[in-house]
Amino acid sequence: MQQLQNVIEAAFERRADITPVNADTAIREAVSQVIALLDSGALRVAEKIDGQWVTHQWLKKAVLLSFRINDNQVIEGAESRFYDKVPMKFADYDEARFKKEGFRVVPPAAVRQGSFIARNTVLMPSYVNIGAYVDEGSMVDTWATVGSCAQIGKNVHLSGGVGIGGVLEPLQANPTIIEDNCFIGARSEIVEGVIVEEGSVISMGVYIGQSTKIYDRETGEVHYGRVPAGSVVVSGNLPSKDGSYSLYCAVIVKKVDAKTLSKTGINELLRTID
């Protein structure tokens, strides 16, 4: 694996000079191998190690290099044709392979090669970009988008129209992460490498980026870039110091543990916030 990483790192340093015409065999094979490993879930752009999320930047570099070495090509689709550098993940799947891998794909869901979809996942008409990882038992609902390199945990529900931000560039930026057993409400947007920690519930229409204040009304604490585990979050506003205006924020209205979350309906949690 280290040899593979070394090839990617060296090629990335001279990426400006690499084209589909002059890319050598070693680079092509290395990039193809990485994309295949991402596609199978053997590698992932980010993973939790000793309780901390670690981003493997060299894998992002491999994805970016794939755009340098590949030309656009005609891609066949269900009702149309497309023209892009990245083939669709399921282009060569037959019924046996779908059954073996154990997930459902509802047309016209679009999933790019180099993303991983785990068993017992349901993809409604949605979009999953290259480098993304969607773990077991999750639902990507209608018109939801999982951006490049985003990490979606086990038993996550991404409701209709949810946007999970992607990140390939700038290179040092970390991917957006939704940990296990989270619920993201309809039309919410989680972007810019924000981490929603395990067991959290995000209400409908909540927008969270790195600069969004995440206000805990019980403690008065303000978080940035991280929703603490077990949070129930709704959209709100915080007043300015002089009270002349207010600015949007996300509000943690309560905390729930895994036991409460498993026994209580999502709607009930969001209705009883007073």
Curated annotation (Swiss-Prot):
GO molecular function: 2,3,4,5-tetrahydropyridine-2,6-dicarboxylate N-succinyltransferase activity; nucleotidyltransferase activity
Record key words, sorted: Acyltransferase, Amino-acid biosynthesis, Cytoplasm, Diaminopimelate biosynthesis, Lysine biosynthesis, Repeat, Transferase
InterPro entries in the record: DapD_Trfase_Hexpep_rpt_fam, Hexapep, Hexapep_transf_CS, THP_succinylTrfase_dom1, THP_succinylTrfase_N_sf, Trimer_LpxA-like_sf
Catalytic activity: (S)-2,3,4,5-tetrahydrodipicolinate + succinyl-CoA + H2O = (S)-2-succinylamino-6-oxoheptanedioate + CoA
Pathway as given in its UniProt record: Amino-acid biosynthesis; L-lysine biosynthesis via DAP pathway; LL-2,6-diaminopimelate from (S)-tetrahydrodipicolinate (succinylase route): step 1/3
EC number from the UniProt entry: 2.3.1.117
GO CC term (a single one): cytoplasm
Gene3D superfamilies: Hexapeptide repeat proteins (2.160.10.10), Tetrahydrodipicolinate-N-succinyltransferase, N-terminal domain (1.10.166.10)
First-tier enzyme category under EC: transferase
Entries under Pfam families matching the protein: Hexapep_2 (PF14602), THDPS_N_2 (PF14805)
Superkingdom of this protein's organism: Bacteria
Cell compartments where the protein resides: Cytoplasm
GO biological processes: diaminopimelate biosynthetic process; lysine biosynthetic process via diaminopimelate
Family indicated by similarity: Belongs to the transferase hexapeptide repeat family.
Protein name: 2,3,4,5-tetrahydropyridine-2,6-dicarboxylate N-succinyltransferase
Organism annotation: Erwinia tasmaniensis (strain DSM 17950 / CFBP 7177 / CIP 109463 / NCPPB 4357 / Et1/99)
Lineage of source species: Bacteria, Pseudomonadati, Pseudomonadota, Gammaproteobacteria, Enterobacterales
Gene name, Swiss-Prot/TrEMBL: dapD
